[in-house]
């Protein structure tokens, strides 16, 4: 998983040249221990409450989306994330099922071995012994398949669930910038109204000071508008890259899964084919 994560990072043009990434890859000494990793650490709780607060803020302030593209992509992202979550849950169930099959096969083979050791019929005992070997082979195949499914299927899909969360966080950051922009525009309106009232009241000194504050607020609003436009364009570019990579990766994930599954089924078939002749010598 770490290898896939680092490959994804160095494949990004901007992140590839990041000094922290370069240091991580070239550092020869032991890496520093992670901090605030506890589930209930103070830093973790602060991040959680901040996320909850931002979520409620987004609910409270509705964004009138002027770009149809973002409206469509956010809806599409929600649907894709839900589909990936379901697929991840199914892949986890598949892994657990294969592990259970491996464990059951091991238990069954031990029982067969005990049965073979106390069987009076030599031919039947030999057949049970070969069946024990067959079940041991089958259990080992399911164990290897569960490990491959974990690495190539479940973890890979789980990684994309996290990537969809990051994508939604990017949409959320755009919403936050828009919200700050709207707040800045509202602040300009308030200051202009205050300046007008002061001028009508003859308080020219205070009105002049407020005029400077208004100009500063206008500059801030203009900067936020530019920032909003930039983040919107950047998200569009990154989303296009993400979609291209996602399609390529999902195809590779499914192909690897099917290849390993076919290989496992071939091994199972060979195990049963080796055992099949032994049944012919069992006395009836």
Q: Across the structure, where does each feature detected by a protein language model lie?
A:
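Domain-level detector for trafficking modules
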Residues: 1-66
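C-terminal, extended alpha-helical scaffolding domains
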Residues: 45-281
């Amino acid at each position: 998983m770490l290898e896939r994560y680092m490959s994804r990072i160095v494949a990004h043009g901007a992140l590839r040249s990041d000094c922290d990434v370069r240091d991580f890859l070239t550092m020869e000494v032991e890496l520093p221990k992670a901090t605030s990793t506890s589930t209930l650490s103070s830093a973790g709780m602060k991040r959680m409450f901040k996320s909850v607060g931002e979520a409620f803020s987004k609910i409270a302030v509705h964004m009138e989306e002027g770009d149809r593209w973002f409206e469509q992509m956010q809806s599409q992202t929600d649907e894709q994330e839900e589909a990936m979550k379901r697929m991840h849950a199914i892949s986890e169930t598949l892994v657990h099922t294969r592990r259970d099959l491996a464990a059951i096969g091991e238990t069954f083979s031990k029982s067969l071995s005990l049965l073979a050791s106390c069987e009076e019929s030599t031919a039947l005992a030999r057949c049970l012994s070969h069946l024990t070997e067959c079940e041991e082979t089958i259990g080992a195949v399911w164990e290897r398949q569960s490990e491959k499914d974990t690495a190539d299927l479940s973890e890979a899909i789980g990684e994309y669930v996290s990537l969809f969360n990051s994508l939604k966080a990017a949409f959320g950051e755009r919403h936050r910038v828009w919200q700050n922009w709207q707040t800045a525009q509202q602040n300009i309106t308030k200051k202009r109204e205050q300046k007008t009232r002061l001028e009508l009241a003859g308080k020219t000194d205070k009105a002049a000071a407020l005029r400077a504050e208004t100009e500063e607020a206008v500059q801030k609003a203009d900067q936020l508008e530019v920032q909003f436009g930039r983040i919107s364009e950047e998200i569009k570019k990154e989303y296009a890259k993400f979609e291209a990579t996602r399609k390529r990766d999902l195809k590779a994930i499914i192909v690897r899964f099917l290849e390993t599954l076919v290989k496992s089924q071939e091994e199972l078939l060979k195990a049963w084919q080796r055992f099949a002749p032994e049944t012919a010598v069992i006395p009836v």
